[in-house]
Amino acid sequence: AQYTYEGKNYGTHDAIGAGIYLRHVWGPQVPGAYKDPQPNHTAYAWTWIYSPKAQEVGTWIEFQNYSRSEMDLPPMQGKWDYKESRIWVNDQEITPPVWTATHREKSNEIPLGNENCVSRKPTPVHLEKGWNKVFMKLPVGTFNTPEVRLVKWMFTFVCVTPDGEKAVEGLVYSPDKQLK
């Protein structure tokens, strides 16, 4: 499959799941979506979500999953990560939450805040009745940065109930707008 933008063709492939690694931090030992990922590239991910009604849902959104075994710094306020990842639903950009960890000195003795999506309230998103477009821009520079030692080129996106307790019933995820 391919995607054409401004007269140039780009290769595509399907990925199934709520969390996708484009490149795993352990490199070739744990394969990601890209067979031979290279630094200084940008990937794009999209899907359509069919909603049987207009509704407010929660979403788990994440572009870097943190662990305290590393001395990684939390993202800067107003940014999802240090890679400049971005996400839009129905052409409206979804901004990151206010990060509770704001330290700028590396230490693995500082507890994680709400950096990981499952440790915070889901991000509210409005779905229209019918098809809703989800689009993500996923740039990556180097796979090791001063802020984050093990850069995780990945994304998580899934709709959940506003309280985050379960999946939203009746939704269909389809990059081809197919009700299956």
Q: Where are each of the predicted segments found?
A:
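Activation corresponds to long, low-complexity, non-globular regions
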Residues: 1-13, 166-180
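Extended carbohydrate-recognition surfaces in non-catalytic/accessory domains of CAZymes
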Residues: 1-53
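Extracellular and analogous surface-interaction loops
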Residues: 45-58, 123-129
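Beta-strand elements of well-folded, non-transmembrane domains
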Residues: 47-53, 63-67, 140-142, 161
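A short beta-strand element within beta-rich, extracytoplasmic domains
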Residues: 53-77
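Short, solvent-exposed aromatic-acidic interface loops
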Residues: 65, 100-103, 174-179
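Beta-strand-rich ligand-recognition modules
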Residues: 73, 78-155
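Short, solvent-exposed loop/turn motifs
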Residues: 93-94, 165-167
